[in-house]
């Protein structure tokens, strides 16, 4: 989760429910800035316990660079519908098919961006069908399961959800401070909007958290499968990350032949920790593809 999520959408952005063949999904759709030539469309997938608002601070700067951005709540996240207790609908292949349905509903090819859990869902969608995508950017999202320390914290969250209400779990996380992948505002953290973050937490379906939490703890390494596809890749992260250590992300980028960006003074959520340099790095990558680059180092 991004703890500095911004709940006020950019000027001219529209919040609506995107109708797809697999149901409706809540989105924030931010256009290209006035007077700027359109360069492409971006679909953005949030992480565990996150939401579309985790990308709000990127949307205006990307619009100024010519990119329409559509940030989406996945099935069972915040303002998108999903069952409370049926974990089967949140299986990784099902979430990947949701992404393909979202792209089809947008009616255009997209640059796909996934933060953390969203990156692994994005990867699964690309492996199902990479044809609708112009590129894939993995933001603080690693090759396989999360680190041991984060697995322990996610297990604690899953255990709590078995015995406590969502409201009770929120109170515990506020008191203790969250793991990077089990979202609540850290005590004394000044930039978040606590009531909106609580509202987001309460809107997320418990079954979605249980299913995706398990996925984070068991995800296999699928980098070789991804590298076999003809698609430009970008691995972007902060300078520190306990969920997937930065050297592991460096290695993954090499295995993918991906562009690699490290955002200084950012941690697990560069999209909210340092949105301006993150937006610039994203747009620079996509602009390079428009100029005929492969997105891969040395090519």
Where are the regions that the model predicts?
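Active-site loop/oxyanion-hole signature of alpha/beta-hydrolase fold enzymes
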Residues: 10, 20-21, 64, 71-113, ...
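Flexible "cap/lid" loop of the alpha/beta hydrolase fold
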Residues: 123, 127-128, 133-164
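Alpha/beta-hydrolase fold catalytic core
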Residues: 1-42, 64-67, 107, 134, ...
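Conserved HGGG/HGGXW glycine-rich cap/lid loop of the alpha/beta-hydrolase fold
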Residues: 26-82
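Conserved alpha/beta-hydrolase catalytic His-Asp/Glu region
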Residues: 147-152, 165-228
